[in-house]
Structures are given as C-alpha cells and as structure tokens.
C-alpha cells in the first residue's frame, strides 16, 4: 500500500478537508451576505453546492481527526471507494456551480453592466464568492485525485 498525500487518516488529508471547509464556508457567507443573490439561480446553486461541500468535508475532517487520535487505518477498499465517489461527485458539482456563477458574474460586470446600472447589487461579493468557490474546488480536485490514486494502489 502506498502512502498517498491527502489520504484519509493523515495530517495532509485532514488539512485538505479543513481547507475545503473553510473556503466553502467563506464562499457561502460571501454569497449569502450579498444583496439580491437569491434572484439568480446560479448563485443559489453555488450556495447549495458549497453547503454540500462544507458538510461532506466537515464529516471527513472529523473522521480524519478521530482516526489520528485513535491511530486507526482508514485505508479499507470499501471506505476509500465511498470517499472516491463522494469526492468526485462534490468536485463536479462544485466546479459546475463555480463556473455557472462566474459566468453570471462576468455577464453582470462586463457584458450588460448591471453592476453600474444597479449599484445596490453586491457584485464585489459575487466575485469574492466565486473566487473562494474555485479555490475550494482546487482543494476538492486535489483530494479527489489523491483518493482515486489511493484506491488504485489498494
């Protein structure tokens, strides 16, 4: 069995999960605090996707902490298969939500100039939330690849 960076039950795995939680939570807070986000489906989808990512990552971070405290091995093929599927599903959902929200944000900023016409829209917060969502996705993608690599090595 290989020692893969970011595998469950390791410090690197826990740090990946905690980073996912922090950035997903920050993305949700930035978007939820923006005026008028609920009028646009892509932004609601971003909140739902980042909320799901937050819950998934928090659960796995807690599992990593438990594993580190009790020195249990989480490299069971069935358990790692569950992690692989969960990571890939949340990675795809998060990337789709971040991309859709980025498209709407660019449309507002550059194409139709909604941000100038309607200054009450929080376009800066929309942008911040999208940036945080893409950072979250980069951590999720790293985790998904390492889980897949670990599964292949079991």
From Swiss-Prot:
One Pfam family, short name please? CASP_dom
Which family is this protein grouped under? Answer: Belongs to the Casparian strip membrane proteins (CASP) family.
**Alphabetized UniProt keyword annotations:** Cell membrane, Glycoprotein, Membrane, Transmembrane, Transmembrane helix
UniProt keyword annotation of Lyase present: no
| Species this protein is from | Oryza sativa subsp. japonica (Rice)
Query: Which segments sit on the Cytoplasmic face?
Result: 1-17, 64-77, 151-154
**Cellular component terms (Gene Ontology):** membrane; plasma membrane
Localization annotation: Cell membrane
Subunit structure, interactors included: Homodimer and heterodimers.
Name of the protein in question:
CASP-like protein 5B3
Membrane-spanning parts: 18-38, 43-63, 78-98, 130-150
Which residue spans belong to the Extracellular compartment?
39-42, 99-129
Q: Could you tell me the membrane topology recorded for this protein?
A: Multi-pass membrane protein
Q: Which domain of life is it from?
A: Eukaryota
Enumerate the InterPro entries for this protein. CASP_dom, CASPL-5
Q: Which coarse location class applies to the principal site listed for this UniProt protein? A: membrane
- Positions of glycan attachment: 39
């Amino acid at each position: 069995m290989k020692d893969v960076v970011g595998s469950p039950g390791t410090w690197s795995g826990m740090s990946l999960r905690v980073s996912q939680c922090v950035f997903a939570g920050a993305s949700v807070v930035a978007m939820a605090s923006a005026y008028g986000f609920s009028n646009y489906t892509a932004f609601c989808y971003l909140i739902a996707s980042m909320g799901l990512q937050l819950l998934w990552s928090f659960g796995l971070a807690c599992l990593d902490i438990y594993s580190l405290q009790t020195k249990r091995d989480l490299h069971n093929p069935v358990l790692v298969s569950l992690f692989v599927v969960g990571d890939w599903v949340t990675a795809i959902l998060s990337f789709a939500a971040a991309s859709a929200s980025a498209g709407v944000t660019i449309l507002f900023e550059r194409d139709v100039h909604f941000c100038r016409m309607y200054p009450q829209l929080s376009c800066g917060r929309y942008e911040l939330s999208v940036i945080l969502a893409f950072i979250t996705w980069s951590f999720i993608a790293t985790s998904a690849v390492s889980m897949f690599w670990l599964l292949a090595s079991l």
